[in-house]
Amino acid sequence: MPGRSSTSSGSTRYISFSGIESALSSLKNFQSCISSGMDTVSSVALDLVETQTEVSSEYSMDKAMVEFAKMDRELSHYVKAVQSTINHVKEERPEKVPDLKLLVEKKFLALQDKNSDADFKENEKFVQFKQQLRELKKQYGIHADRENDLTEGVDEDMIVTQSQTNFICPITQLEMKKPVKNKMCGHTYEEEAIVRMIESKHKRKKKACCPKIGCSHTDMRMSDLIPDEALRRAIESHNKKKKRHSE
């Protein structure tokens, strides 16, 4: 609870919110822990696909990611409720100090009541996890839950070969080593090449267009780029197999 001066007037002019703001800072730091947890789950899930390791539904990485996404949403709602309450009290400056805990709980519950599965579409980590998992499964010819697996009996190398065009950077025309994906249009590039291109354009006060032929995205920013872990793994796996076959 916020501390107060020795004055007994109860005026909000004497309320110190430093304690609450310090606690908020700690909560925001915990959000980074949740983010790290989601990165770990994503990495393990991709490992399982790459090694084609079966796990029971009890230990599903999808379920773990959903739980992290729920924690992230709940924590975000609580932080928002506290910040909203502090701002409201500072603006209204009521004569009598309100029950801050009660106000926060009301705002928090109001936010929680609006929860829906659609919220996960706004969680960047969750969306990235689903996309990368889907892409890696596609590279290996694995369908979700192995249902309606029309690729059974099809040579895995052929499936990967069909996707090899995705391995080439549209800028360097070479196979990518550190592919990054454009969140806005979905195209991928070699990280060093696209970063250099964007920086060069921005230094000349020009907009950077997606170098993929036919793409309509004409204002690329560094913040649009995310590591394409699924594609990186697929490229590495393909190269390992190619090396084994040549030996």
Curated annotation (Swiss-Prot):
Binding site for Zn(2+): 185, 187, 210, 215
Positions of post-translational N-acetylmethionine modification: 1
GO cellular component: chromosome, telomeric region; PML body; Smc5-Smc6 complex
SUPFAM superfamilies to which the protein is assigned, alphabetical: RING/U-box (SSF57850)
Chief place where the protein resides: nucleus
Biological processes annotated in GO: cell division; cellular senescence; double-strand break repair via homologous recombination; positive regulation of maintenance of mitotic sister chromatid cohesion; positive regulation of mitotic metaphase/anaphase transition; protein sumoylation; protein ubiquitination; telomere maintenance via recombination
Start and end residues, zinc fingers (SP-RING-type): 154-240
EC number(s) per entry: 2.3.2.-
Glycyl lysine isopeptide (Lys-Gly) (interchain with G-Cter in SUMO2) crosslink site(s): 90, 107, 125, 130
Listed name of the protein: E3 SUMO-protein ligase NSE2
Gene: Nsmce2
